[in-house]
Structure formats: C-alpha cells, structure tokens
Amino acid sequence: MQHSADFGKEMRVALDWHDPDMLRALLRLRLATGLSLDPEKVVFEDLWPQLCVSHYRGEETSAYIIDRSLMRPRNMLKIFLHAKGFASNLSHQRIEETDLEKGVRAYSQDLLVELDRELTDVFPAAKDILYHFIDTPEELDQAQIEALVKEAGVDGDDITKLVDFLLYYGILGVKSENEHVHYIYSVNYDLKILKIRAARNRKFVYVMNPAFMPALGTTESAQLRIH
C-alpha cells in the first residue's frame, strides 16, 4: 500500500494538524480576519457565541465541527461556510442548530463524493465502496466489514488492503474495549498503531467517522469517546 505514489499524499501534507486546539486557533484567525478584527485581540470564546449557537445536542459546536473535519483545516472551514450559508439564507443573526445540522449534512455529502473518487484513484477496486455503507450501523465488527467489502465486489487479499485504505483515509476508526475510538489522525497517520491496537483487542469494532454519517444515513450508537 505504501508503494502507491499518491496514497495518503494529502494527509501527509497535513500531519501537523492533529490537535483540535490548533484548528480552533486557525478558525479564530480566519474569523477575525474576515470580520476585520485584530486577531491578537480576539478571544475565541468571546467571538464564537456571536457567530454560532454554543451547543448542538449537548456538544460544544466548535468541537462538533472539528470532530467532523478529519482534522483537515479546509474541511473545518467548509463546514462553517456551509452552515453560515444556510443561516444567511434564513436571515438568522448567527448559525443556529438547524443551520449547523444542514451545513454538516451538505459537507458530508460533498466529502462522500470526494473521498470515493480519491479512493478509486489510488485503489480502482474500491470504486463506489463507500456507498455500500449506506444505512449501516455506526459500529461494525470484522465479519460485517468483510461482508460489505465482498458485497462491493472486492475479495481475496484485496479485502485487507481495502480495509487498510479505509482506516488510513480516516473513514473508519478502531474502538477498543475501553470504549475509546482512535482514528488515523490521532496516531500521526501510523497505520501500524491502529492495526496492532485492533489485534490486541478481541472485542474491537470498526467505527464510521461521524463526518460521513449524515450522507450515509448511518445508525448512531451510544456516544463514543474519540481520541
């Protein structure tokens, strides 16, 4: 897999973006600049509530957005701009819960199309693979993942390769027995860490990244702790 020339190219460029606080700082900078404010004098916690509702379904909204960005700055900004667009169209003074929900759904659909193409470019056998996850549970065990992959027409050694791709692109994470969910960007894009962590936990399951769940109609499970 590592011999594929383009594999993970974009993720490796963004390796430094693994800290939510760094992304939040970037968002503060972009917002301040867009509002013609002095970034050095802007406190995120003071500015954000003026632009967006503070919580969505009990979760702080900037954290909610960042958790669905795959830790990519441009994705974080896409979500915000989608939500802002819905708020503007409805003449809302700030982004409300319904605007954020619609924004995340629009972003999720864009991301689904984008990542499906990206996967197909580096692994042609994976064409349309993400669409086979439509209406599936948030958590899937090894047997369920293999069944979905086979349904997509992938078999043999390609099954393991494809699952590796899904992990590396952040589409799937690994949930261990302690309920923590680990995605590739939380282990500095070291696939070995995810695979060894899974191998050590007999009861591990794969977890769909929340970024894709709205577009795929994923059935949500109890709230997970994401690392």
Regions found by a protein language model. Give the residues of each.
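Winged-helix-like regulatory helical subdomains adjacent to P-loop NTPase cores
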Residues: 58, 67-157
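C-terminal/domain-terminus segments
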Residues: 88, 147-152, 161, 183-194
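Short amphipathic alpha-helical interaction segments
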Residues: 152-169, 174
